[in-house]
Amino acid sequence: MSLATHLKYQQAVFHGLHFTPCTLEYGTLWSNAKHPERGSCLVCERPGFYTLTVADYTVASDFSVPFLIRQPFLRFGSFYEGHTSFEIEGFQTSTSLPSNYIVKEANISGRQNWHENEHYKGIEIGLSFAYLEK
């Protein structure tokens, strides 16, 4: 997944959460003005190089988002609250529980699922290899 693809994936997640963007001087705040109790996600980025996402939100209704990762991409962060489920082609259905992580992803596809009333809280940094090679 290139960084641009990662940002498109994030936007699909935010739309599934019924969040809309508000551009700030230092990033973009995604939230639902009609339901502020559902939380928000703040995305700060240097286009083409890295993205920092801070999230604290509750899912309003079930949804899923497909993903396709071709180019190597590095993600690391801390997932403090929530329970994710995802399907990766060629692997059994998997889940994630709160943890710290660092993962290099390449040449995988699948789907991630979110479930109504699940609460998620975490922080993630995504890095393009172009940034790492500079």
What is each PLM-predicted segment?
Residues 1-40, 45:
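General N-terminal leader/first-domain-start detector
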